[in-house]
Amino acid sequence: SVRQANITSQYYESESRLLTKYYQLDSQNLEYSLENLQIEYQKEDDLYMLEDKINDSQVLQLSFVQENDSLKIISLKTINLEE
């Protein structure tokens, strides 16, 4: 259906924006690059999370960690927002 195609398209656009931000990050200087690129993020312990709004009811969240001198993606998940 057209609606499903739109939702799929929104998801991939959101994924593309998140991955673009992720690959711009400097693993050697992570905190600085997050601030310098003005990327909003959350941090819990060693886990960093970037989010991008898919539509009015969903957000896509990319989680990653810094290991040695590199970044490693842990998950990419859709989160339903409360109605």
Which role fits each region the language model picked out?
Residues 1-83:
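Beta-strand/loop motifs with alternating small/hydrophobic and polar/acidic residues, enriched
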